[in-house]
Structure formats: C-alpha cells, structure tokens
Amino acid sequence: MRVSEISKRYAKALLAVAKQKGIHTQVHAELQALVKSFAGDVSVKNYFENPMIGSDQKIAAVKASLSGKGVSEEVVNTLVLLAEKNRFGVLEQISFAYRDLLDLEEGVTRGVVRSAQPLAADAQKDIEQKITKVLNKKIVLTYEQDPKLLGGIVATVGGWTFDDSIDTHLKKLNEELNRRAN
C-alpha cells in the first residue's frame, strides 16, 4: 500500500509516544483492529470520513465508543486528532506506516509465500527457518494460495525471491534439454 507523508508523520509520532510508555506492540494491534473494524462496517467508515459531519460529533463518537474500553489513550488521542483534522481517511495508511516503522526498529523483514495448495504448519515453520537462515534476519511471512502455480512455492522476502515452483523447474529442465540438443 502506498502511504502518504502525513500518514508517516502520524505513525512516527504515535510510535514515539507508544515506545516511551512501552505499549508499541499493543498500539499496533489496536490500529489493526480499528482498520479491520472500519473495513467491516462501511456505515462507521462513512460516518467518520463524511466532511458534512462536524469534528465535535466525531470526537464525541470516538470518546464514547473507545475511551475506557481497552483502547489505549494514545490511540484514542490519535483518532481524536484525525477527527479534528478531518483525516480519518488515512487511518489505514497510518496503520501500515506504523507497522513498517515498528518492523524497521525491531529488525523484522516481511514477506509473502505463494503456493498452489495451503501449506501445513510444519511446512510453514520449515520455510521460515530456511529463509531466516539464508537472510540472517527476523522474518514474518504471510501465506497465500496462487492457483496459477502448478505446485511448489514462491517466496518473496525483503527484495529476495526464492522460487521453488514446479513451473520454474520445468522451465529449467526445458532450457537444459534445449541446450543439450544444440
């Protein structure tokens, strides 16, 4: 996702405050939950993104629905600020920017593993261990099914691509056979 500069600024400020209080991972989880909640309820999203609704009403709604309900004061204050500035539309970008900044500080590299079929938990663990060993970095992988793959996996992590798909093996075999035939 493309993240605006303003979203990066909000995320950086929120991370700085959250780190001071030692709640940076909690804040990350809260941001993700809020983004998911907004995506799941279009009427709530439309309410907060509607410029015709005054910021006072939005602030009151934020405080009434989140204050004292397990959401950190830092996240509530950020949402209040977004309501004041009529910038609720960048909440998802702030969440992504926050995650990226947190990953950078914790030395985490994210990646995606695509496979034709769902991978068993032990296969996922094995893949993570092998990629961690090769890159010598802490990694977090997400797994996706790709019906275009005949079999095997394709992992893209931190600018690296590990392609162990049947498609690639067949291409290499074809190239080798053509090379030997000539």
Curated annotation (Swiss-Prot):
Binding partners and assembly: F-type ATPases have 2 components, F(1) - the catalytic core - and F(0) - the membrane proton channel. F(1) has five subunits: alpha(3), beta(3), gamma(1), delta(1), epsilon(1). F(0) has three main subunits: a(1), b(2) and c(10-14). The alpha and beta chains form an alternating ring which encloses part of the gamma chain. F(1) is attached to F(0) by a central stalk formed by the gamma and epsilon chains, while a peripheral stalk is formed by the delta and b chains.
Cytoplasm as UniProt keyword: no
Topology term for the membrane: Peripheral membrane protein
Any Pfam family hit: OSCP
Species whose genome carries this gene: Bdellovibrio bacteriovorus (strain ATCC 15356 / DSM 50701 / NCIMB 9529 / HD100)
Family: Belongs to the ATPase delta chain family.
Keywords (A to Z) from UniProt: ATP synthesis, Cell inner membrane, Cell membrane, CF(1), Hydrogen ion transport, Ion transport, Membrane, Transport
Function per UniProt: F(1)F(0) ATP synthase produces ATP from ADP in the presence of a proton or sodium gradient. F-type ATPases consist of two structural domains, F(1) containing the extramembraneous catalytic core and F(0) containing the membrane proton channel, linked together by a central stalk and a peripheral stalk. During catalysis, ATP synthesis in the catalytic domain of F(1) is coupled via a rotary mechanism of the central stalk subunits to proton translocation. This protein is part of the stalk that links CF(0) to CF(1). It either transmits conformational changes from CF(0) to CF(1) or is implicated in proton conduction.
Chief location of this protein within or outside the cell: membrane
InterPro entries registered for this protein in UniProt: ATP_synth_OSCP/delta_N_sf (IPR026015), ATPase_OSCP/dsu (IPR000711)
Protein's UniProt name: ATP synthase subunit delta
Subcellular compartments: Cell inner membrane
CC annotations in GO: plasma membrane; proton-transporting ATP synthase complex
